Amino acid sequence: MAIHDELLAAVDGKRGVDAADRLCEACVTLFDVDAAAISLVFDGANSGTLGSSGEPARQYDELQFILGEGPCLDSVSSRAPVLVVDLADLDEARWPVYGPAMLDLKVRGVYAMPVLVAGEYIGALDLFRAQPRRLEDHHFAGAIAAAELASLPLLDLLDTDMQAAFGDPNSDAWADLHTLSRAEVSQATGMLVAQLGIEPAEALVRLRAHAYATGRSATDVARDILDRRLRLGEED
């Protein structure tokens, strides 16, 4: 069976997050990688993990969100695949914080393929390897096909909300995508905007910085803000 057919079989009959998870699991099996995730990106910031092959993949994606750098973000901004065979290679030191953090997690290779939906680059398929190896040509072609298929579960979730969100960056449509694992971060960012009288971009940076400084996930910090267990002040 051709790789494309195997990818289609993996998502057959599935929808939304379930389809995204199955697609990521198939990528791990078919492309000789150790983890895979599909990220949703809006306004230049990694805003959610749509699907993953498991908890390690979600952790790798969460790091991009906390640190504000990584293959997914670069893939979307450049509208092209990002292929880093070995994060330990000094010539590949494009992410001064994310790279060393991933090496600490025993990940050497990272590869990202942009996901295009309705003419907009709104996410990426991320692949991770413990050992530094170039993607074989047929695996690279398969990853491109998988990124194209990733648009299907995205369309399931975004549906009419996607058009509202693209039409108005301030729309509540993005907050309404509650099936994403990090909806709390968007809501907490809005609370910080109201509390501190700052711009959304600055509010997100403060939330990320607090998460990184305290060794917690951005999602956990967001939940504390929403539950009023944490209030970030001017000094954060």
Q: Could you say what each language-model-derived stretch is?
A:
Residues 140-152:
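Allosteric cytosolic regulatory segments
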Residues 35, 99, 112, 124:
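Short hydrophobic/aromatic beta-strand element in the GNAT-like acyltransferase core
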Residues 1-67, 223-236:
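Intrinsically disordered, low-complexity terminal regulatory regions
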Residues 159-236:
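Signal-transducing coiled-coil/dimerization helices and immediately adjacent hinge/linker segments
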Residues 87, 124-133, 138, 155:
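Short beta-strand-to-loop transition segments that serve as allosteric relay/switch motifs
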Residues 109-116:
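Short hydrophobic beta-strand micro-motif common in sensory/regulatory domains
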